[in-house]
């Protein structure tokens, strides 16, 4: 067997249907579009979700939820990230300077993930319950 002798199996390939080529073809005259109506016209397409003038489903159902603009300026910080810092007093500006969070972040929350090895003083940051207890157990404290 050679690549130049390969051919598709019988019936595997179909020739495309030629539209508008006589009654005997099965697709003559109206070319499979039926008679009249919007879908029979050239250049016509019915928009997605259109239900023939009936109020469409996406407008019958109520709106819900919203996208909070705060989510783009809020982030989480792991305890394990804080133990590698050069300073022991940590606030939002320190996290930005050390490139732990991006410059546009306005709110950061410290979460319990990993172990804390050095005592830290946290100022002006949100802290989860688990992270708070871990910070206090290592001799640090949470202010504000």
UniProtKB/Swiss-Prot annotation:
Keyword flag Nucleotide-binding: no
Keywords: Ribonucleoprotein, Ribosomal protein, RNA-binding, rRNA-binding
Domain of life: Bacteria
Region (Disordered) residue spans: 1-52
Entries under InterPro entries matching the protein: Ribosomal_uL15, Ribosomal_uL15/eL18, Ribosomal_uL15/eL18_sf, Ribosomal_uL15_bac-type, Ribosomal_uL15_CS
Pfam families (alphabetical): Ribosomal_L27A
SUPFAM superfamilies the UniProt entry points to: Ribosomal proteins L15p and L18e
Cellular component aspect of the GO annotation: cytosolic large ribosomal subunit
GO terms of molecular function: rRNA binding; structural constituent of ribosome
Gene3D superfamilies tied to this protein: 3.100.10.10
Biased composition (Gly residues): 21-31
A biological-process GO annotation: translation
Subunit and interaction comment: Part of the 50S ribosomal subunit.
Record's function text: Binds to the 23S rRNA.
Family: Belongs to the universal ribosomal protein uL15 family.
HAMAP family (UniProt xref): Ribosomal_uL15
Listed name of the protein: Large ribosomal subunit protein uL15
Gene it is expressed from: rplO
């Amino acid at each position: 067997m050679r690549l130049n002798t390969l051919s598709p199996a019988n019936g595997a390939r179909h020739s495309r249907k030629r539209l508008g080529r006589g009654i005997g073809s099965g697709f003559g005259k109206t070319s499979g579009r039926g008679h009249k109506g919007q879908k029979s016209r050239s250049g016509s397409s019915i928009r997605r979700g259109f239900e023939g003038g009936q109020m469409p489903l996406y407008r019958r159902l109520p709106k819900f939820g919203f996208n909070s603009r705060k989510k783009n300026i809020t982030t989480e910080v792991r305890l394990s990230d804080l133990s590698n810092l050069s300073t022991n007093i940590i606030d939002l500006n320190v996290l930005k300077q050390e490139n732990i969070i991006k410059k546009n972040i306005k709110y950061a929350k410290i979460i319990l993930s990993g172990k804390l090895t050095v005592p830290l003083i946290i100022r002006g940051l949100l802290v989860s319950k688990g992270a708070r207890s871990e910070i206090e157990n290592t001799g640090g404290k949470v202010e504000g």
